[in-house]
From Swiss-Prot:
Organism: Homo sapiens (Human)
Region (C-terminal domain): 1639-1821
Family label: Belongs to the LTBP family.
Positions bound to heparin: L344, T345, E346, K347, I348, K349, K350, I351, K352, I353, V354
PTM comment text: N-Glycosylated. Contains hydroxylated asparagine residues.
Location of the EGF-like domain: 187-219, 396-428, 622-662, 844-886, 887-929, 930-969, 970-1009, 1010-1050, 1051-1092, 1093-1134, 1135-1175, 1176-1217, 1218-1258, 1259-1302, 1303-1344, 1345-1387, 1485-1527, 1528-1567, 1733-1773, 1774-1818
Record's disease association: Glaucoma 3, primary congenital, D: An autosomal recessive form of primary congenital glaucoma (PCG). PCG is characterized by marked increase of intraocular pressure at birth or early childhood, large ocular globes (buphthalmos) and corneal edema. It results from developmental defects of the trabecular meshwork and anterior chamber angle of the eye that prevent adequate drainage of aqueous humor. Microspherophakia and/or megalocornea, with ectopia lentis and with or without secondary glaucoma: A rare disease characterized by smaller and more spherical lenses than normal bilaterally, an increased anteroposterior thickness of the lens, and highly myopic eyes. Lens dislocation or subluxation may occur, leading to defective accommodation.
Entry protein name: Latent-transforming growth factor beta-binding protein 2
Range of residues in the leader sequence: 1-35
PANTHER family (alphabetical): COMPLEMENT COMPONENT C1Q RECEPTOR, EGF-LIKE DOMAIN-CONTAINING PROTEIN
Residues with the Phosphoserine modification: S506
Amino acid composition bias (Basic and acidic residues), ranges on this chain: 744-757
Length: 1821
């Protein structure tokens, strides 16, 4: 648990801990008992405690009106952050109710003030404006008891007394400073006028503005740009969106804005109407387009100016405004939305929230009340799966992971509270019938809203996601009491229980404000939009004149202030700015003017929204952006309503930048082994874990991959670009690829099929009735046909038609259509319950009976000769278009008369009465009537109740007093000191009583106080008196006990107990006792109360040579020292004569007994070791004979010096002298040589040193020379002439012994990523690459099936989509239809292709003919290469075949009719055998890898794709497209072996180093292996001194100059090895023969055993019968003896080196046998080849049947011919040539092949003899 920290407000310490706020929960209620409630259900004092200012329609009361009470059970505190002028003086009687006009006039306090601490979120009055004082009723001068009198305009009174500290001038605060609340320190700056728009006062007269504001008092709104979450584009923030006071009604939920402009300076507030068009006319036309997921707000923050103005760069709490519950709530302007993509918010599992609550309360003392606000701890909460509860803070926070549309509110993790006009899980469905109530979701949220709590809603981005234009948004809802405010600091996503590093949500690039953020965003739900002619003109920003018809250049964005990315063709300004352009111009480019959110007719001109253009004076037509050239590079453009989207072709997908299409092979999830080397026909050196081909081949690590050993493609080839589109060193993660899909909504899945057309999409069905729609081919909208948005049925869908509409000739006033449009008029049926176009066929037709269902909607249709008229039902009115009936908003007439909140409903309304009123219903009329609270019992207990309008007040009786809550409270007379001076005062309602005190008490000031008896002398003698309430108690001293009445102490007779003095005589005394006459071995203790044992061991001299053990009354000597033993009596230790013991010995000396030990007297030159052995004296341990330039080595009776480099031995080898290197030759080329002690110096520049190889001055690698001390735990990086220290290995890496950071291969766990994907290790992490049809799970550790039916919109058109494992099927609902995959819809059976009568009978198609399929590779003769056998013509010619059949008929070309007949579904698709449904053949993707087998991709692995396949070459191979196969890649041409010799092999290479260079970790560089042992701690772990002579078990004559391994020492001139003098095996022993590998070869050669040519012989596993360790436990190794040559065999191995060979003919009666001979494996070893013996690698029996190559981190093996490397065991295993070369018949014709160790033998059949050439047997001649 992290320590609790205390947040501090400016200038005062937090005095009350945050734990005091524990009672907070999701639905806490403040304790009742207050006199009355304010209009939103909160309690407030009665009468004149506060004047209530009201908002129209039940808005929040003014901040000055609401008295909010805390949870601390103290006197309640007023709202924090209010100016003193806002706290009205109390008065008697009822408050004056504002008139209707006044109630409708929003006050300044209503507009700008919130219940929050002043230093945090208070909004001040703008510069130059005065806050209107609340209207108060005149109150009598009589003040109320306990209520402070406050001046209306007086500033905060400074504390009394003289101030000290900072900013103090003359005992008072300096100008510009004031004291902070509850402190006496002048640390609070003053800004007059105050900072506006929630700006904070940083220093005197210096405001720090929030984002989006500027000015000296933050009064100016910055014309910045905000990302529109709904339309997924950056749009200019208009006046209605910038206002900090913007509110949206939560009851209506239809997008209506209710806000007021700021009042003019010095003028009272006046009612304002919202500007026209502030919300899009179709912003909520269909909820399915309001996608929820990624969203982002991008704001530009200005820098500080010269006017002492500061600007905050902090990210604002969210794209919308803070939301509080109550009757009116502020919600974000738009619903958070995302492109058509996966809803990433659903995958959020664990979220962290960092917030700070603020608590305000009022404390009153001595008639003075003070307001105190304190900030709680900055608290971090975690939410698992959407719910979180922190027991420390008492908060319960939930996250809304679902979208609540149409004004709905999230009340749980997966639950929305919907308004009256919508229903569904997301509030996305309209109410089916106007008179039907919403589904039962009202009870719980309604009770929630009426609770005396506040709900704060914050919409914030997840702060630890990667920065992008569309970060995930999370809505955080917090319910809390009104006196608390919450500030959210951070919302971060936590993965896997570990808190990841945070990433700032910043966007450095600025896209154009009206360009779609990404492909896939659709701005409108219909291709046609009407202009709203019934609304006032909407003010638009001034735009440059647009000359019609003038063509110019259209630019998409700007780069460094210059227009960039122009389109390929010239366009008009309207076409450019209305579609994808951001700038336009002919000679000079200018920004495009902003577009309206919906069609608006202004000054007779039609302004169309983004993505639409004018069709005529009243219609806007969708712009087909896909006609613009170059819009979707390497992708297909799909036009949408008001926008477009780019989709990649099959087999491709968008890369993470969403700017280009890459092959889906780049995120293949298939895993396999990655091989670092290739041998002849096989892969070698595989990595330990399976990885993807991308990781293997794109990272330069592997040469081949997969079970088929597929060679990695060469860089620059098409195959390389497919899997590595980003080049070497980069791969794509599947999580980086966003599929251009979205989940279908519930109503879309249940929607009936609709016809498909040529265009992208049509209108969606209406909410009232579901009926098929037609796809719009050329759509437009008419002005004046959209119903009012107040209608609950409006704003859902705009039905589109495919032709021009007929005009209503009734009351609709619209211009006629052109004649050419009228000529095409046809009858059209349209659902009237949605936003429709009223269409007619021809005049004279009865429209009311033309088949449409209730044309007028909620009304009666009256047919007229030239049209029709609608007579609306009660509660409805005629729409301004005169075409149908819409809901009448009765609330505009205030039917509730200011006594309640009016909620308009479809065809009716409802009054929600304020507290103090009750609802009275009379027919269709509702009104609020006053409640007579005085009729309720106990309302004014102790007083008289007087009812008032909407409230009541109490007149208190005698003995009672009016409290601030409006109740009569009994006066406690007992509080006065003079009441009952000689007794106890008992208060009673309205009076009191005096009672006499009990015993032990006395009267004092009306109370009975305890008498302290302990003050009386003599009480509790021999004890301690403890006063009790009304009595006392005695606690006795030791030796005394309490009397029975506990009022005294008496002596205890300790001698009465046998436990006292058990070993002596007991004598009782007063309060104690004494012991005497103790037994033998005991003595009396110091206090005389016991006979204690006498510890003899404490006396000196007892057991001097042993351990004295004390016993009861005695002691004994035990555990005698070495050389001593206990005496017979056990009371002493006596000496032992060790020289008498035959087991004791003094090896090499004379034994002499001593007291407690013995001595070994050694001869001269030896010294005693271990007390028993005389060893040679090590002179090197004494004086430094060879120091300081040599190392002293002891010898038998002497020593010699091993001189350091640069010194030579002198004086008979007993000293070292310096060698002057500069005297011989100048070793410093390009520098000056200076001889030094033991060396020389080349004078070079700082940071450089002479190279030991060239003598030139080269850079000093400080990191290598000095190692870890240079940078400690950090990583050292060398630089020319210097070095730098950087942080060590990053997470996901571990440090290798050489200091390199090596990636941790998480994919070592085979279960990672499951069975439908494979793990792809990346640098520092890993990713799961899933198979086709699968996607990565939310955990990221496995692959799950992709439900294409949910993610792909209308993938099967009108057919039913059925998801299957890894794919999906399209099924028609009717058995009489079949799905046409080419056209994408269901059609009647037999409509195309073969008719039903022609279809074959039965359920299966006839079996096709199968023959051989031939490839057409270059360099091969036609029909010479069989690609596959037993294939059909479709399987051959529709895939990779060139010809087919016995006649080798050529396959038709792809553009021929014959090819279309054989392959109707195209190349890569073949008919499904047996799938014959109603006469139609089903086609599927051809799996070429299965059809043609391994022959399709030799030296590689075949991977099937849809359609086609790819060859994943083995490591060391690359794909040759011309030959269609994997060919060997010559790594030696890529400089794969640095400082060594590279030898290319089939599929791999070998790097050989010249001594003393060895291979490094990469296996591609030779480096110096003679580094210091400090750099290589385990490099020479098996290197030590080699001793040439061993005498008397003493090693002598060490091998001078270097150290060796155990095998090197014993097999050359040594007899013992290492400091432990490990003896070598005898040279005549079998162990020596095995160790040095010499005698065995000679013995076997003498026995006539011949060895295979080209191979060096080494012992096998069966030959090692001796212990694998030497005598001292050190390992010994095989040693390869000198190479030898013997006569060549009769049949040489074809893989060996060619030479003249003479056949050896055996007896004709016996089968010939090939017997290999021992020859040199490399007649001429290549230069740089490290021909090391196995033991030189410092390994144990390693690399048998091969050479050991020692590298820095260990060793590797180069196997002899006939053997191959088993990388798992690092051993060379035999190659079975008889099975490896396609069977023994190839090797031994007319005989049989027998495999041998490292070779093989051919046994010829009778009548055949061995042939000298190929390994065959020929007939005898």
């Amino acid at each position: 648990m992290r320590p609790r920290t205390k947040a501090r407000s400016p200038g005062r310490a937090l005095r009350n801990p945050w734990r005091g706020f524990l009672p907070l929960t999701l639905a806490l209620f403040v304790g009742a008992g207050h006199a009355q409630r304010d209009p939103v259900g909160r309690y407030e004092p009665a009468g004149g405690d506060a004047n209530r200012l009201r908002r129209p329609g039940g808005s929040y009361p003014a901040a000055a009106a609401a008295k909010v009470y805390s949870l601390f059970r103290e006197q309640d505190a007023p709202v924090a952050g209010l100016q003193p002028v806002e706290r009205a003086q109390p008065g008697w009687g009822s408050p004056r109710r504002p008139t209707e006009a006044e109630a409708r006039r929003p006050s300044r306090a209503q507009q700008s003030r919130r219940v929050q601490p002043p230093a945090q979120t208070r909004r001040s009055t703008p510069l130059g404006q005065q806050q209107p004082a609340p209207r108060t009723r005149a109150a009598p001068a009589l003040p109320r008891l306990g209520t402070p009198q406050r001046s209306g305009a007086a500033p905060p009174t400074p504390p009394r007394g003289r101030l000290t500290g900072r900013n103090v001038c003359g005992g008072q605060c300096c100008p510009g400073w004031t004291t902070a609340n509850s402190t006496n320190h002048c640390i609070k700056p003053v800004c007059e006028p105050p900072c506006q728009n929630r700006g904070s006062c940083s220093r005197p007269q210096l405001c720090v503005c929030r984002s989006g504001f500027r000015g000296a008092r933050c009064e100016e709104v910055i014309p910045d740009e905000e990302f529109d979450p709904q339309n997924s584009r950056l749009a200019p923030r208009r006046w209605a969106e910038r206002s900090p006071n913007l509110r949206r009604s939560s009851a209506a939920g239809e997008g209506t804005l209710a806000r007021a402009q700021p009042p003019a300076p010095q003028s009272p507030p006046a009612p304002q109407s919202p500007p026209a068009g502030t919300l899009s006319g179709l912003s909520q036309t269909h909820p399915s387009q309001q996608h929820v997921g990624l969203s982002r707000t991008v704001r530009l923050h200005p820098t500080a100016t010269a006017s002492s103005q500061l600007s905050s760069n902090a990210l604002p709490p969210g794209p919308g405004l803070e939301q509080r519950d109550g009757t009116q709530q502020a919600v974000p302007l738009e619903h958070p939305s995302s492109p058509w993509g996966l809803n990433l918010t659903e995958k959020i599992k664990k979220i962290k929230i960092v917030f700070t609550p603020t608590i305000c309360k009022q404390t009153c003392a001595r008639g003075h009340c003070a307001n105190s606000c304190e900030r709680g701890d900055t608290t971090t909460l975690y939410s698992q799966g959407g719910h979180g509860h922190d027991p420390k803070s008492g908060f319960r926070i939930y996250f809304c992971q679902i979208p609540c549309l149409n004004g709905g509110r999230c009340i749980g993790r997966d639950e929305c509270w919907c308004p009256a006009n919508s229903t569904g899980k997301f509030c996305h469905l309209p109410i089916p019938q106007p008179d039907r109530e919403p589904p039962g979701r009202g009870s719980r949220p309604r009770a929630l809203l009426e609770a005396p709590l506040k709900q704060s809603t914050f919409t914030l981005p997840l702060s630890n996601q990667l920065a992008s234009v569309n970060p995930s948004l999370v809505k955080v809802h917090i319910h809390h009491p009104p006196e608390a405010s919450v500030q959210i600091h951070q919302v971060a996503q936590v993965r896997g229980g570990v808190e990841e590093a945070l990433v700032e949500n910043s966007v450095e690039t600025r896209p154009p404000p009206w360009l779609p953020a990404s492909p896939g965003h659709s701005l409108w739900d219909s291709n046609n939009i009407p202009a709203r002619s019934g609304e006032p003109p909407r003010p638009l920003p001034p735009a440059a004149p647009r000359p019609r018809g003038l063509l110019g250049r259209c630019y998409l964005n700007t780069v460094n202030g210059q227009c960039a990315n122009p389109l390929l063709e010239l366009t008009t300004q309207e076409d450019c700015c209305g579609s994808v352009g951001a700038f336009w111009g002919v000679t000079l480019c200018a920004p495009c003017p902003p577009r309206p959110a919906s069609p608006v007719i202004e000054n007779g001109q039609l302004e169309c929204p983004q993505g639409y253009k004018r069709l005529n004076l009243t219609h806007c037509q969708d712009i087909n952006e896909c006609l613009t050239l170059g819009l979707c590079k390497d992708a297909e453009c799909v036009n949408t309503r008001g926008s477009y989207l780019c989709t990649c072709r099959p087999g491709l997908m968008l890369d993470p930048s969403r700017s280009r299409c890459v092959s889906d092979k780049a995120i293949s999830m298939l895993q396999g082994l990655c091989y670092r080397s290739l041998g002849p026909g096989t892969c070698t050196l595989p990595l330990a874990q399976r990885i993807t081909k991308q990781i293997c081949c794109c990272s330069r690590v592997g040469k081949a991959w997969g079970s088929e050993c597929e060679k990695c493609p060469l860089p620059g080839t098409e195959a390389f670009r497919e899997i590595c589109p980003a080049g070497h060193g980069y791969t794509y993660a599947s999580s980086d690829i966003r599929l251009s899909m979205r989940k279908a909504e519930e109503e879309e899945l249940a929607r009936p099929p609709r016809e498909q057309g040529q265009r992208s999409s049509g209108a969606l069905p209406g909410p009232a009735e579901r009926q098929p729609l037609r796809v719009v081919t050329d759509t437009w909208l008419e002005a004046g046909t959209i119903p009012d948005k107040g209608d609950s049925q409006a704003g859902q869908v705009t039905t589109s038609v495919t032709h021009a509409p007929a005009w209503v000739t009734g009351n609709a006033t619209t211009p006629p259509m052109p004649e050419q449009g009228i000529a095409e008029i046809q009858e059209e049926q349209v659902t009237p319950s949605t936003d429709v176009l009223v269409t007619l066929s021809t005049p004279g037709i009865d429209r009311c009976a033309a088949g449409a269902t209730n044309v007028c909607g909620p009304g009666t249709c009256v047919n007229l000769p030239d049209g029709y008229r609608c007579v609306c039902s009660p509660g409805y009115q005629l729409h301004p278009s005169q075409a149908y009936c819409t809901d009448d908003n009765e609330c505009l007439r205030d039917p509730c008369k200011g006594k309640g909140r009016c909620i308009n409903r479809v065809g009716s309304y409802s009054c929600f009465c304020y507290p103090g009123y009750t609802l009275a219903t009379s027919g269709a009329t509702q009104e609020c009537q006053d409640i007579n609270e005085c009729e309720q019992p106990g309302v004014c207990s102790g007083g008289q109740c007087t009812n008032t309008e909407g409230s009541y007040h109490c007149e208190c009786d005698q003995g009672y007093i009016m409290v601030r809550k409006g109740h009569c409270q009994d006066i406690n007379e007992c509080r006065h000191p003079g009441t009952c001076p000689d007794g106890r005062c008992v208060n009673s309602p309205g009076s009191y009583t005096c009672l006499a005190c009990e015993e032990g008490y006395r009267g004092q000031s009306g109370s009975c106080v305890d008498v302290n008896e302990c003050l009386t002398p003599g009480v509790c003698a021999h004890g301690k008196c403890t006063n009790l309430e009304g009595s006392f108690r005695c606690s006795c001293e030791q030796g005394y006990e309490v009397t029975s009445d506990e009022k005294g102490c008496q002596d205890v007779d300790e001698c009465a107990s046998r436990a006292s003095c058990p070993t002596g005589l007991c004598l009782n005394t007063e309060g104690s006792f004494a012991c005497s006459a103790c037994e033998n071995g005991y003595w009396v203790n110091e206090d005389g109360t016991a006979c204690e044992d006498l510890d003899e061991c404490a006396f000196p001299g007892v057991c001097p040579s042993g351990v004295c053990t004390n016993t009861a009354g005695s002691f004994s000597c035990k555990d005698c020292d070495g050389g001593y033993r206990p005496s017979p009596l056990g009371d002493s230790c006596e000496d032992v004569d060790e020289c008498e013991d035959p087991q004791s010995s003094c090896l090499g000396g004379e034994c002499k007994n001593t007291v407690g030990s013995y001595q070994c007297l050694c001869p001269q030159g030896f010294q005693l070791a271990n007390g028993t052995v005389c060893e040679d004296v090590n002179e090197c341990m004494g004086e430094e004979h060879c120091a300081p330039h040599g190392e002293c080595l002891n010898s038998h009776g002497s020593f010699f010096c091993l001189c350091a480099p640069g010194f030579v031995s002198a004086e008979g080898g007993t000293s070292c002298q310096d060698v002057d290197e500069c005297a011989t030759t100048d070793p410093c080329v390009g520098g000056h040589c200076v001889n030094t002690e033991g060396s020389f110096n080349c004078l070079c520049e700082t940071g450089f040193q002479p190279s030991p190889e060239s003598g030139e001055c080269v850079d000093i690698d400080e990191c290598e020379d000095y190692g870890d001390p240079v940078c400690g735990t950090w990583k050292c990086e060398n630089s020319p002439g210097s070095y730098r220290c950087v942080l060590g290995c990053q997470p996901g890496f571990h440090m290798a012994p050489n200091g390199d950071c090596i990636d941790i291969d998480e994919c070592a766990n085979d279960t990672m990523c499951g069975s439908h994907g494979f793990c792809d290790n990346t640098d520092g992490s890993f990713r799961c690459l899933c198979d086709q049809g699968f996607e990565i799970s939310p955990s990221g550790w496995d692959c799950v099936d992709v439900n294409e039916c949910e993610l792909m919109l209308a993938v099967c058109g009108a057919a039913l989509c059925e998801n299957v494992e890894g794919s999906f099927l399209c099924l028609c609902a009717s058995d009489l239809e079949e799905y046409d995959a080419q056209e994408g819809h269901c059609r009647p059976r037999g409509a195309g292709g073969q008719s039903m009568s022609e279809a074959p009978t039965g359920d299966h198609a006839p079996a096709p003919t199968r023959m051989d399929c031939y490839s057409g590779q270059k360099g091969h003769a036609p029909c010479s290469s069989v690609l596959g056998r037993n294939t059909t013509q479709a399987e051959c010619c529709c895939t990779q075949g060139a010809s087919w059949g016995d006649a080798c008929d050529l396959c038709p070309s792809e553009d021929s009719a014959e090819f279309s007949e054989i392959c109707p579904s195209g190349k890569g698709y073949i008919p499904v055998e047996g799938a014959w449904t109603f006469g139609q053949t089903m086609y599927t993707d051809a799996d070429e890898c299965v059809i043609f087998g391994p022959g399709l991709c030799p030296n590689g692995r075949c991977l099937n794709t849809v359609p086609g396949y790819v060859c994943l070459c083995n490591p060391g191979f690359h794909y040759d497209a011309s030959h269609k196969k994997c060919e060997d890649h010559d790594e030696c041409q890529d400089l794969a072996c640095e400082n060594g010799e590279c030898v290319n092999t089939e599929g791999s290479f070998h790097c050989f180093c010249s001594p003393p260079l060895t291979l490094d970790l990469s296996q591609q560089r030779c480096m110096n292996s003679t580094s210091s042992t400090e750099d290589l701690p385990d490099h020479d772990i098996h290197m030590d001194i080699c001793w040439k002579k061993v005498t008397n078990d003493v090693c002598s004559e060490p091998l001078r100059g270097h150290r060796t391994t155990y095998t090197e020492c014993c097999c050359q001139d040594g007899e013992a090895w290492s400091q432990q003098c490990a003896l070598c095996p005898p040279r005549s022993s079998e162990v020596y023969a095995q160790l040095c590998n010499v005698a065995r070869i000679e013995a076997e050669r003498e026995a006539g055993v011949h060895f295979r040519p080209g191979y060096e012989y080494g012992p096998g596993p069966d030959d090692l019968h001796y212990s694998i360790y030497g005598p001292d436990g050190a390992p010994f190794y095989n040693y390869l003896g000198p190479e030898d040559t013997v006569p060549e065999p009769a049949f040489p191995n074809t893989a060996g080196h060619s030479a003249d060979r003479t056949p050896i003919l055996e007896s004709p009666l016996q089968p010939s046998e090939l017997q290999p001979h021992y020859v040199a494996s490399h007649p001429e070893p290549p230069a740089g080849f490290e021909g090391l013996q196995a033991e030189e690698c410092g390994i144990l029996n390693g690399c048998e049947n091969g050479r050991c190559v020692r590298v820095r981190e260990g060793y590797t093996c180069d196997c002899f011919e006939g053997f191959q490397l088993d990388a798992a065991h690092m051993a060379c295993v035999d190659v079975n040539e008889c099975d490896d070369l396609n069977g023994p018949a190839v090797l031994c014709v007319h005989g049989y092949c027998e495999n041998t160790e490292g070779s093989y033998r051919c046994h010829c059949s009778p009548g055949y003899v061995a042939e000298a050439g190929p390994p065959h047997c020929t007939a005898k001649e």
